[in-house]
Design a protein with these regions (language model features):
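Acidic, PIN/NYN-like endoribonuclease modules and their adjacent C-terminal/linker elements
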Residues: 1, 95, 99-126
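A generic structural signal for short hydrophobic patches within well-formed alpha-helices
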Residues: 9-10, 39, 75, 112-113
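Short hydrophobic interaction/assembly module
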Residues: 54-73
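Structured helix-beta-strand junction loops
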Residues: 28-29, 61-65, 101
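Active-site neighborhoods of divalent-metal-dependent phosphate/nucleic-acid chemistry enzymes
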Residues: 67-108
C-alpha cells in the first residue's frame, strides 16, 4: 500500500516536473490509501486553485481508492508523531495513517525526511 501526501498530489495534478517524478511512485488505485485529511487538504487547495468541477473529479477518484477516516488508533499515533517528530497536526495524521496501515508515504515535503516508511520526491526546480 502507498499513501500519497497532499504535496505529491498537488505536484502530480499540476503536471510539474516534480509531478512527473511522483508518477513513477504512484500505485494502482487498489493499493492507494487516501486519509480523509488528504481529502480535506485537496478539497481546500483544488477549490481555491481550479474550481469545484475539478475538485469533484479528484475527490471522486479518491473514493475509488482506500479512503481511511481518522479513528482513535490513528489519532493516538498522530499525537505520538507530533511529540516525537515535531510534525504539525495534519502531517502527523497523514504519517500516522501510513504507519498504522503499513503503507509507504509518498511526499514532496522535506519535513518528512528521515522518518521511517517515507519516500520523499525531491522538488525539481523548473
Amino acid at each position: 500500500m502507498r499513501l500519497v501526501d497532499t504535496s505529491a498530489w498537488i505536484e502530480w495534478l499540476i503536471g510539474s516536473p516534480t509531478g512527473e517524478a511522483v508518477t513513477a511512485h504512484l500505485p494502482e488505485q487498489s493499493d492507494w490509501l487516501v486519509p480523509t485529511m488528504v481529502q480535506l487538504e485537496l478539497t481546500k487547495w483544488l477549490t481555491r486553485e481550479v474550481g469545484e468541477d475539478k475538485t469533484d473529479q479528484v475527490i471522486a477518484f479518491t473514493q475509488l481508492c482506500h479512503v481511511v477516516p481518522l479513528d482513535t488508533e490513528i489519532a493516538l499515533a498522530a499525537a505520538e508523531a507530533c511529540r516525537v517528530h515535531k510534525l504539525a497536526t495534519a502531517d502527523a495524521i497523514v504519517f500516522a495513517t501510513a504507519r498504522v496501515h503499513d503503507a509507504v508515504l509518498i511526499t514532496c515535503d522535506a519535513h518528512f525526511d528521515g522518518l521511517p516508511g517515507v519516500t520523499r520526491i525531491e522538488k525539481i526546480k523548473a
